[in-house]
Design a protein with these regions (language model features):
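Conserved helicase C-terminal RecA-like lobe
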Residues: 2-94, 98-105
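Long, charged, helix-prone linker segments
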Residues: 107-135
Length: 135
């Protein structure tokens, strides 16, 4: 057993990727949720990113620098989405023969399969239809 982080450069005959949903692997869509954001905060702001952005503006000497609430949260989301997509790629490419990917609906049932997983499933189904064979 290994994490995706520690598996880079390694391969196994069978790989299991768990919880590939829009919380653990968000795509940047409006309905995605993020670990760094709390549901009870207005506009689901990432407080750490917003605080750092405010500190940068305070230290800035430019006349045209200003704090735009929410921009830092959006930037942090996109950074997180990129990092998680790279990590998912690492996980997928560790499989030599078998790749098993699962997702869950979360505690409240509001989670969906990750958009990247849905795209992969669509691609796989196209290939099966085009070339035949079992999935």
């Amino acid at each position: 057993i290994s994490t995706m982080h520690k598996s880079k450069g390694l391969e196994w005959d069978r790989v299991y990727l768990m919880s590939v949903n829009n919380y653990d692997f968000p795509s940047g869509r409006e309905y995605d949720r993020y670990i760094s954001e709390s549901w009870f905060l207005r506009d689901h702001l990432n407080l750490e990113a917003e605080a750092l952005a405010q500190l940068e503006i305070l230290q800035s000497t430019g006349d045209y620098d200003w704090y735009d609430e929410g921009r830092a949260s959006q930037s942090a989301r996109m950074d997180y989405v990129s990092e998680r997509l790279r990590l998912l790629y690492v996980g997928i490419t560790r499989a030599k023969r078998d790749l098993i990917i699962t997702w869950n609906g979360g505690r409240d049932g509001g989670m969906r399969p990750a958009e990247s997983l849905s795209a992969l499933i669509g691609y796989w189904e196209e290939q099966m239809n085009e070339f035949g064979g079992e999935g």
